[in-house]
């Protein structure tokens, strides 16, 4: 099941209870979507099954998201070994664009401030998902594509290019030449290899 359109019976910041075809659904949500009782809404769903080893029970929970991108990020997060659904939900309490930017720019310090995420988990999130979300940052920075091509032509590998894109800060108000940006990127890559 990808999404569900249902009538809201109860809603708060953690749970939505909805009815569809005379069946009640309890859906865990990351934040208060301000859903109105007795109104219809659509949530993108993910069913998570966990096994209770000592009781041989399978427990299924439904997680719901307002946007498909939130659902995709949730799936990406729980694919990481030390991140479970509760931690992923805590991460998604923040604005999705803020989280994607943090992953793309490897802002481990910010991610580590989120409840349930320690420094090690934040590093894992950045290391395993950075490649997926680096392009989102590139779309916001028009110079990033030119920088990527320039560094690739100079023989730098993909990891160095991704690192440079996340580290180079450009004031878009000023008219800066791409060669200056490439120069800054090369300095950042050099500093990285010195450490």
Curated annotation (Swiss-Prot):
Notes on the domains: Has three domains with a flexible linker between the domains II and III and assumes an 'L' shape. Domain III is highly mobile and contacts RuvB.
The record's subcellular locations are: Cytoplasm
Q: What is this protein called?
A: Holliday junction branch migration complex subunit RuvA
Start and end residues of each stretch annotated as Domain III:
141-195
Q: Where is this region: Domain II?
A: 67-141
Family of this protein: Belongs to the RuvA family.
Q: What Gene Ontology cellular component terms go with this record?
A: cytoplasm; Holliday junction helicase complex; Holliday junction resolvase complex
Native source organism of the sequence? Ureaplasma urealyticum serovar 10 (strain ATCC 33699 / Western)
UniProt-listed Pfam families? HHH_5 (PF14520), RuvA_C (PF07499)
Self-association state and partner proteins as the record states: Homotetramer. Forms an RuvA(8)-RuvB(12)-Holliday junction (HJ) complex. HJ DNA is sandwiched between 2 RuvA tetramers; dsDNA enters through RuvA and exits via RuvB. An RuvB hexamer assembles on each DNA strand where it exits the tetramer. Each RuvB hexamer is contacted by two RuvA subunits (via domain III) on 2 adjacent RuvB subunits; this complex drives branch migration. In the full resolvosome a probable DNA-RuvA(4)-RuvB(12)-RuvC(2) complex forms which resolves the HJ.
Question: From which lineage does this chain's organism come?
Answer: Bacteria, Bacillati, Mycoplasmatota, Mycoplasmoidales, Mycoplasmoidaceae
Q: Where is this protein chiefly located?
A: cytoplasm
Q: What superkingdom heads the lineage?
A: Bacteria
